Amino acid sequence: MPTPPCPCGRSESYEKCCGRFHGGTAAAPTAEALMRSRYCAFVQGDASYLLRTWHPRTRPARLDLDPGMRWTGLEILDTADGSAFHTTGTVTFRASYRGGSLHERSRFERVDGAWVYADGEFLD
């Protein structure tokens, strides 16, 4: 039986995709990869990963995820910078959930060489 694809939308299995980042065996190499892994963490309810990958300057003291929230898909709409050669980047995306969607432009920065989520701007 084929392995289901990662919730982030890539065709790889969770273990070969975002699971490596969640488990700490690899770091997201780009801002988009971090965005996808953070979406996947929301799907899985992994608040500790979300906090770990949040910029220390903007990170909340705690994060309470709604256990009833059902995320249903991620669409990357645009990326700017955020590669291995950049220190900042943005990812514009639409994340769908049961009953609606979230449209955001997220800003990412490198801290000690690792990509972290800095903040985001809700769109429409």
From Swiss-Prot:
Transmembrane segments: none annotated. It comes from the Bacteria. Belongs to the UPF0225 family. HAMAP family: UPF0225. This is UPF0225 protein SCO1677. It comes from Streptomyces coelicolor (strain ATCC BAA-471 / A3(2) / M145). The lineage of its organism: Bacteria, Bacillati, Actinomycetota, Actinomycetes, Kitasatosporales.
